[in-house]
Amino acid sequence: MKHYEINKDMRYLQLLAQSFPTVAEASTEIINLQAILNLPKGTEHFLADIHGEYEAFLHVLKNASGNIKRKVNELFGNTLREAEKRELCTLIYYPEQKLELVKQNEPDINDWYHITLHQLVAVCRDVSSKYTRSKVRKSLPCDFSYIIQELLHEHTEDHDKTAYVNVIVDTIISTGRADDFIIAIANVIQRLAIDQLHILGDIYDRGPGAHIILDKMRHYHSWDIQWGNHDVLWMGAAAGNDACICNVIRLSLRYANLATLEEGYGINLIPLATFAMEAYKDDECAEFIPKMSGGAADIDEKTQRLTAQMHKAIAVIQFKIEGQLIAKHPEWKMDKRRLFEHIDYEKKEIEIDGKIYPMTSCHFPTINPASPYELSSEEELLMTKLHHSFMVCEKLHKHIKVMLQHGCMYTIINDNLLFHASCPLNEDGSLKEVEIFPGKKFAGRELMHQTGMQIRTAFQSDSDPKEREYAIDYFIYLWCGPDSPLFDKSKMATFERYFINDKETHKEEKGYYFLLRDDEQVIDHIMDAFGVTGPNRHIINGHVPVRTTKGENPIKANGKLMVIDGGFSKAYHNETGIAGYTLVYHSRGFQLVQHEPFTSMEDAILRGTDIKSTTQIVEMSNRRMLVADTDIGQELRKQIADLEELLYAYRHGFVKESERKK
């Protein structure tokens, strides 16, 4: 017999009784929750480092990392030809566009509707089978909710039921609603195929469509993000950190991909172009010609030259503002990154760590050698305009709000610890203390938590003004500071890569986390420190591209660490040999899905091309995981315990039953 402290819990029980005012209702809820505990766990998808590649990312969401294709093969493997299965998959991924094509080419459209509707219902029935009817119902569009429920839950083995289903299908067609129904059920299939999506950072970067991805995520049913270094850079820009604004613009120009800045957010770059053309009119800006792996292959020579001038102009301003911030915050210990003062402008040389290096060029018309970090009056005016553009961009601030609502520095879910890049360590593998606030040091979980709080402080207008100013400044440390959990390298050698040919200066020494993360004991120590328990616990990261062509393995530390940056970004395709990973965690275990490069949405619609994916089984269980085995299961058991206490209180007269108010 359970012992309850009814008097102590009375206030809570009275509140709970408002939702379940009778013994019957409380009992029914316990039965429902117990039933949910025994369903298979939902499928979690883990993606990382999307870098603005919206077409590939959205396609992976639509095909559920190949899961929908697998379902179609299982259902129709022997009854449909390969081409027909491909057509059906494309219809599920891109229903509106595919319907347009079908109607142009199909001689008997009603017959096609009849067959296709039955096929779609079969796929939907399969993907919905692991959910409660209530959860499926909540996923359905209002217009077709009742009809889809009827079709999903009628078994066609019964002859009378077959006739009933056929009448529903015929009526959908005869009333001219077939297209709308197909679009609705295709979207339901997409939604139910992924129960929970985890993005391990870097929605933003050089790709053309970070804004398109965030428009999609604003309305996505269930997702979270562990912020990456590029996300935090854009958050810093939105918060008003001018060094972050310069970095964001510089990276876009480096890859000649201005779509997110100009088309997505309407950032006006004309003042920068005007300034750059004048200030660098006599400069070849050879080091600043955009990378061909971005959008540069599609621009003419004149535009390329202008892009290079803008690129150099913003880079010089960036180095100046970073120099100012480093001087303002000596506690960051980044003084070595103030490089302008070490340039001999006449000899065109620079001294770094006691060594003299020749520079590729030394044309800096806006630098005053006596005060090298001071912006010229024209640069000041330009930064005022750019700062204003970022601060008044409503869409950017909406997207950053979405990132704050759904994101944090780390997440612990179902015995998995998720973070984008690093957890700073000492040489012996112990957790490294990092100074976030002046005079305050944190390590491990507390470091991640305090960093996340610092980021949020930058966006809270009611914060202490000095604390908020520091939080806004701190974004640049998170981007390139040596002990930042989002960087964790000795330096960011941006200046050296532009101006020094000697590759030795380009080296960025990785922090101890990256050097020790293949050690199972180190990974266990980190998980212990974060309170991650369970026999099948893991750390999941992104950030560092896995170069499969060089034989690198995404599975490390005897299976306890998984690195899933496979290179969504086109710039990394040649390096990684693939175009991204999805880690899929379903009721049977973990599978790592390796994607080949995506051609285009147009190609997928016209020719039915899908992303070719190879699946590697990482960890399989001989027992199917249930909701009871997950974090949600723990929460449901607590709810059941509370309801059982309420039943006891009802039956022993501590709380009175009442009629539900109509």
How should these model regions be labeled?
Residues 1-662:
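Feature recognizes metal-dependent phosphohydrolase scaffolds
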